[in-house]
Amino acid sequence: MSPVFLIMIPAGYLVGAIPMAYLLSRWRRGIDIRRYGSGNVGASNVIKTAGKKLGLAVFVFDVSKGAIIILLAGWLGLELWQQIVVGLLTIAGHNWPVFLRFNGGRGIATSLGVALVMAPVPALIALSTALTFGFFKKMAPGVFLGVGALPVMSGYFHGFFGVQEHQTVTWGFAGLFLIMIVRRLMAPDSEYSSTVSKAELVFNRMFLDRDIRSRSVWINRNTAAHKEGLGI
C-alpha cells in the first residue's frame, strides 16, 4: 500500500475534524453552537443562530476542506478509489470529530466539496435539489433525495453526465450516502425521542434529520432550554 495513501488517511480525517462552525461561533459570538438551534455543528445552524455572514464562511470552509483534500490526494498521485476513500474520511472527520468528542455536524457541505471533485454535474444537480426543497423549508428531505440520487446518476447515466470511471465513482457516492444516513440515525437522543414510535423515529431521523415532524419546535428546543437554564 502506498505510503502517501497511509499518510493521507489520517490527514483526511483530521482536516475534516476541524470544527469551524464551533470555532467561529465561539470566537465571534461567544456561544457554543451545540447548545443553540438544532445543535448541529454546521453551516446551517450557524446561519440560524449566529448570522448569515458567519454561516457562509463556515459553508465555504467546509466545502473547501472536502474538495481540497481529494484534489491534494489526486495531485499526490493516488488512484481514484484512494482519493475517494480519503474524501469519505474527511466527511467522517467532520461528522465525528475527535476535537468535539466525536459529536460533529452532518457533513453535507463537506460532502458537496468531495462530490464536486468526483463528478461535478451530478453534484450540482444534487445541490440544486437540496436548495429547491430548502426554499420551501424542506432542506433535510431535499438533501436526502439529492445525495441519494448521486449513485443513480453516476451508475446509470454516467455517459450523459460525463462521469469518468463511473463504477468507482458510484461506489464512492454510495459510501457518501451511507455516511449521511448513519450520521442521521446516530444522532443523540433528545427529550422528544421517546414521544414517537421507533419506526417513526427512524423515518424522521433518516428523512427529516430530526426526531419529530415539527421543524419549528425542533430547531428552537436548545435555545429555549438554554434561556430557561439562564433564567431568561
Swiss-Prot record:
Gene (name only): plsY4
Similarity comment: Belongs to the PlsY family.
Predominant location category: membrane
Subunit structure: Probably interacts with PlsX.
Pathway of action: Lipid metabolism; phospholipid metabolism
Entry's EC annotation: 2.3.1.275
Protein's name according to its UniProt entry: Glycerol-3-phosphate acyltransferase 4
Described function: Catalyzes the transfer of an acyl group from acyl-phosphate (acyl-PO(4)) to glycerol-3-phosphate (G3P) to form lysophosphatidic acid (LPA). This enzyme utilizes acyl-phosphate as fatty acyl donor, but not acyl-CoA or acyl-ACP.
One GO BP: phospholipid biosynthetic process
Localization annotation: Cell membrane
